[in-house]
Amino acid sequence: YKRQPHTQKLISMFPKVPRFQDFRQMFDKMADKIDAVTVGVPDHAHFPITIEAMAHGKHVYVEKPMARTFQEIEVMMRAEKKFGVVTQMGNQGHSEANYFQFKAWKEAGLIKDVTAITAHMNSPRRWHNWNPNITHMPMGEPVPETLDWDTWLGVRPFHEYNHDYHLGQWR
């Protein structure tokens, strides 16, 4: 598959790093050289990648959401125990300095008697111009030559490509 110019530039900075289009091939070829795995891919791929990594004895940090269903999470919890690994679901927004600063102020006694915290979000998809009221699958479009659509779909049922599914719009 053809690579985007910005991707090619980054790849050229690390010419000796192995690259794989499919995580299963990566584990097949070099699982013994991997200490831990970070999963930051479309939501529907979190479960299969996390399970595969744990089956290889790898600790896993998986981005939110950890999985799509409670059943997937229960399977992950059993796998974590079975394979003796540590697995964590993270949220980069809740791992930033402001949260640690608040904790330090609270522990120092500068902030006392917190009874409630109210948070607001100004849009259901504030990072994208995406219509949250979609009622049907978008029309199919040609798959870009830089994308392996079948691998991207992974465990999802097949449907035609549309740019609205790509670059963070799969939710």
At which residue positions do the language-model features occur?
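Conserved small/polar residues in nucleotide/adenosyl-binding loops
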Residues: 1, 152
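N-terminal glycine-/serine-/threonine-rich beta1-alpha1-beta2 phosphate-ribose binding loop
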Residues: 2-59, 71-86
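Short, solvent-exposed loop/turn elements at domain surfaces
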Residues: 6-7, 126-128, 160-162
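Residues that form or immediately flank small-molecule/cofactor binding pockets and catalytic motifs
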Residues: 24-25, 92, 122, 157
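A contiguous active-site-proximal alpha/beta segment in oxidoreductase catalytic domains
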Residues: 59-61, 67-146, 151
